[in-house]
Amino acid sequence: MQQIFLRLKQYKNLIIVVLFSFFFNNAIASYIFIPMDEGQTDHLKAYGIAFWTLEKGSTCDWLLNYKGGSFALPYIKEFEKECLIRGVKYEVITDGQMAKITAEIAEPTANMDVMRLEKAPKIAVYSPKSKLPWDDAVTLVLTYAEIPYTLIYDEEVMRGDLGLYDWLHLHHEDFTGQYGKFYASYKYAEWYVNDVQNAENNAKKLGFDKVSELKSAVAQ
């Protein structure tokens, strides 16, 4: 028994160092700070990381107007790994460093704020199903950022699906059913003729004689 106590005494300092290192490392790794200023390596992927953490059930602080609208995430090893995978610049900061940032943001003269994000919104984009992601700037950006979205069009709107989504993106739609501004230049182009035919077929499918009647109903 005495030998056991002697051995424990010999390793006492080592045990203290190991325990101290464990608690110290956890203390310093409290937040993942994602800057959104010119130093960020991939801004779109950074937005995707913020969205992804919300999907994982975590919260995310959006630091409005602080270094370009940065993000602060709870430190979780999986989150750090995902930043590395997606090529997003980040820093691991302590509670103390985060407190200094929030104090700076809270200054009366600072045009900044902290917005706590708690839920990943369900996103819908109003766009024809025939379009590919790279045909549309919005879907191209969302696809690159790895932010999930659903394409909806007239059929889904008429069915009442809008209530399924938290956020809807509309392009510069006029809902007149006039087939857009390209008529004069492209009315004989194959892709334009196909778009017109698809629009007319869709209107008939939904019980309308004219595309303009369908678009009017969708707008309501």
Language model: regions and residue ranges:
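Hydrophobic alpha-helical segments
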Residues: 23, 49-51, 180, 185
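Bacterial N-terminal signal peptides
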Residues: 13-25
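Helical hinge/lid and interdomain linker segments adjacent to catalytic or ligand-binding clefts
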Residues: 31-32, 37, 41, 76-81, ...
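Bacterial N-terminal signal peptides that target proteins for export
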Residues: 2-15
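Hydrophobic targeting/anchoring helices
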Residues: 29-137, 145-148
